[in-house]
């Protein structure tokens, strides 16, 4: 549940470090700029910061035995508070072209960088979860954590790695959405964790764990975004769009639970 707030933190952190030198509201007036290398360094900083919060999530859930729902809910508030303290709730803008080009640029003039980045992340995650031991451990824990532990899987370590990996992806998402929008605020990413749950469920990921594919997640994200785009194209009022998205989330999860009960 801390996904959206980590996206916002990453977007704000990247924004404050990649503002134009002559921007009047610059957070760090004397911040040097080293071109593309600095943009890459800022991305690594965002990933590292979010990974720390992800590791804390994993430790709290694994070693303190706090339910994941409660642990990540608490982390959501912590990350939001950190972001408020860091930015003083001030909107951030005036980004350097080298940063915004990451999200708005195109390869060969027609392939968006964002598409290539999403494709690359999808391929890496597919390889990790289908060809590496960590992926098999993850599915085992999702299916039956007690059985996985008896089988010799280090469940605590695996869950911490899962939370760190997820946080790193949130950081990348925040970095990119900040570049795409050309500005950020503490409320960026608010509620996105629910959209993520809906997209994953639509893509065949079970909320009960142990079932799901990376390809399904990508399809689920595409379907959910097409739904939002269609509602906007049809001129549906924004307030009604939220209602429609909420219905999709409830129906998708309800159908998943019914399938789970039927299998049992």
Specify the residue positions occupied by each region the protein language model found.
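Membrane-embedded helix boundary and interhelical linker motif in transport proteins
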Residues: 1-55, 108
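Short loop segments and helix-boundary regions at transmembrane helix junctions
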Residues: 1-2, 33, 49-94, 128-133, ...
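Hydrophobic core segments of alpha-helical transmembrane domains in multi-pass membrane transport
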Residues: 11-15, 46-50, 76-83, 115-127, ...
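Transmembrane helix-bundle core of multi-pass membrane transporters
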Residues: 29-40, 64, 68-134, 158-161, ...
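Transmembrane alpha-helices
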Residues: 70, 154-178, 190, 194
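Short cytoplasmic-facing helical segments at TM-TM junctions of multi-pass membrane proteins
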Residues: 134-159
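Cytosolic-side transmembrane-helix boundaries in multi-pass membrane proteins
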Residues: 150-157, 227-264
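Transmembrane alpha-helical segments in multi-pass inner-membrane proteins
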Residues: 170, 180-245
């Amino acid at each position: 549940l801390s996904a959206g707030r980590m996206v916002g933190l990453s977007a704000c952190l990247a924004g404050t470090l990649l503002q134009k030198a002559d921007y009047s509201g610059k957070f760090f007036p004397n911040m040097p700029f080293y071109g593309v290398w600095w943009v890459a360094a800022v991305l690594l900083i965002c990933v590292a910061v979010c990974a720390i919060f992800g590791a804390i999530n994993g430790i709290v859930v694994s070693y303190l035995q706090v339910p994941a729902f409660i642990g990540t809910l608490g982390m959501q508030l912590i990350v939001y508070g950190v972001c408020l303290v860091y930015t003083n709730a001030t909107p951030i803008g005036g980004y350097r072209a080298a940063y915004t080009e990451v999200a708005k640029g195109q390869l060969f003039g027609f392939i968006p960088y964002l598409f290539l980045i999403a494709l690359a992340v999808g391929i890496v995650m597919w390889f990790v979860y289908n060809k590496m031991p960590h992926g098999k451990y993850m599915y085992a824990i999702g299916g039956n954590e007690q059985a996985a532990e008896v089988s010799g899987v280090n469940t605590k370590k695996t869950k911490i790695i899962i939370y760190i990996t997820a946080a790193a992806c949130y950081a990348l998402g925040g970095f990119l959405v900040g570049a795409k929008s050309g500005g950020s605020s503490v409320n960026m990413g608010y509620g996105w964790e629910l959209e993520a749950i809906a997209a994953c469920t639509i893509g065949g990921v079970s909320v009960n764990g142990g079932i799901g594919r990376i390809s399904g997640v990508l399809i689920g994200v595409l379907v959910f975004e097409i739904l939002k785009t269609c509602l906007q194209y049809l001129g549906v009022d924004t307030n009604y769009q939220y209602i429609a998205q909420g219905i999709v989330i409830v129906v998708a999860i309800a159908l998943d639970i019914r399938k789970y009960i039927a299998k049992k």
